[in-house]
């Protein structure tokens, strides 16, 4: 397949992290917008992006972009896209998702049905058939309208990329794997420094940190929709990407990554998830309350997603919980703490104003990534 444009959606506020990841894979960025990064690549890039990107939600193959303010325009422009170039005669195809922002066309169901009709019309004319069996591979179309500009892509990932395949057991409000990885990558943490999550839940932060430290690609243990696209991507491209990922793993390393939680059942679930991810030997999990958080090591990192009170009765406990967290952190005077939370009184009860603060959307929930910075460790004498 010739050079194409790919679109990688991500969490709002984390585009710079994903952009850096894509550049590290060797691909040229074509555009950065709120919640997505576009780049150029080939068939191999589809495989490598799905397997290696830690912070993308999925990878879309861009097939068209045009302006439409009426359903007639939407139909005609959709019909002009050379769908036969991407979808074989036996392919299963539908518009699985439509999103519209500040556009005249705003009904997702209408957008989906009109675009599907236009696709069928185009492909009927090309394949000279009246109906399609749709017995082959799946081609899921996603469309996004922003200020009347329609962007059309075919989803190469299928299930969202935050589904790494290791989370068998979950705590009640887990952070997604893609968001956890992005937040870790926003910090200056490196594998030679201790990392502790005192509210580890099902273990997402420690597991993602261990996978980063051991250079384990996040998409190695799952499948992707585009694996079945034999008309576009040779199987060898997938095998080569997996071989590359395997060759880069270095899990024979010394790291100090720890996860604590007050709930023993949750800690056991975290251990099982770490085992599924192949990093259980790199993480120490322990049942421990945040008021008992202490450590003899210096210059450590806390990266965590503390409770922020989804339910009213939980909200009443938050001042005490954040106060305990702040008291424990003050005793770790050389450490840095990074926490994502939507709790508006975080700084008040934590007892310290954040050195940096970043707004991040976790789905539709507005959260803040508070950064409480400790001193830098002294440079080692050579």
Residue ranges, per PLM feature:
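C-terminal catalytic and target-recognition region of SAM-dependent MTase-like enzymes
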Residues: 289-382
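Non-catalytic nucleic-acid substrate-recognition regions in nucleic-acid-modifying enzymes
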Residues: 2-139
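A short, flexible beta-alpha/helix-coil linker loop
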Residues: 100-103, 160, 307-311
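Residue-level signal for inorganic ion chemistry
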Residues: 22, 95, 143, 305, ...
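Class I S-adenosyl-L-methionine
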Residues: 96-98, 144-186
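Conserved S-adenosyl-L-methionine
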Residues: 175-295, 310-311, 317
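Short, charged/polar, Gly/Pro-enriched secondary-structure boundary elements
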Residues: 44-51, 159-162, 378-380
């Amino acid at each position: 397949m010739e050079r194409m444009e790919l679109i990688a959606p991500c969490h709002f506020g984390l585009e710079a992290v994903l952009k850096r990841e894509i550049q590290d894979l060797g691909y040229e960025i074509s555009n950065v917008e709120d919640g997505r990064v576009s780049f150029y690549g080939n068939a191999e890039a589809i495989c490598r992006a799905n397997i290696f990107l830690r912070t993308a939600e999925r990878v879309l193959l861009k097939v068209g972009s045009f302006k439409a303010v009426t359903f007639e325009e939407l139909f005609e422009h959709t019909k002009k896209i050379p769908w036969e170039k991407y979808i074989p005669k036996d392919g299963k195809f539908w518009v699985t998702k439509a999103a519209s922002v500040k556009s005249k066309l705003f009904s997702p169901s209408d957008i989906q049905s009109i675009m599907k009709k236009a696709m069928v019309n185009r492909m009927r004319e090309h394949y000279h058939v009246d109906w399609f069996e749709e017995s082959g591979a799946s081609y899921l179309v996603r469309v996004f309208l922003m200020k009347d500009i329609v962007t059309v892509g075919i989803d190469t990932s299928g299930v969202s990329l935050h589904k790494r395949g290791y989370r068998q057991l979950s705590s009640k409000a887990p952070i997604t794997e893609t968001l956890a990885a992005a937040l870790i990558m926003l910090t200056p943490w490196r594998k030679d420094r201790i990392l502790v999550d005192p509210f580890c839940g099902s273990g997402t932060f420690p597991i993602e940190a261990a996978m980063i430290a051991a250079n384990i690609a996040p998409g190695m243990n799952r499948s992707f929709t585009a694996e079945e696209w034999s008309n576009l991507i040779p199987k060898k491209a997938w095998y080569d990407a997996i071989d590359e990922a395997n060759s880069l793993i270095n899990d024979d390393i010394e790291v100090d990554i720890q996860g604590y939680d007050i709930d023993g059942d949750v800690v056991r679930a975290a251990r099982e998830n770490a085992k599924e991810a192949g990093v259980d030997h790199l993480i120490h999990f322990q049942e421990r309350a945040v008021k008992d958080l202490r450590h003899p090591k210096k210059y450590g990192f806390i990266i965590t997603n503390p409770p922020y009170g989804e339910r009213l009765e939980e909200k009443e406990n938050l001042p005490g919980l954040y106060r305990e967290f702040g008291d424990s952190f003050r005793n770790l005077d050389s450490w840095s703490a990074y926490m994502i939370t939507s709790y508006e009184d975080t700084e008040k009860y934590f007892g310290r104003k954040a050195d940096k603060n970043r707004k991040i959307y976790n789905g539709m929930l507005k959260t803040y990534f508070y950064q409480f910075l400790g001193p830098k460790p002294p440079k080692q004498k050579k």
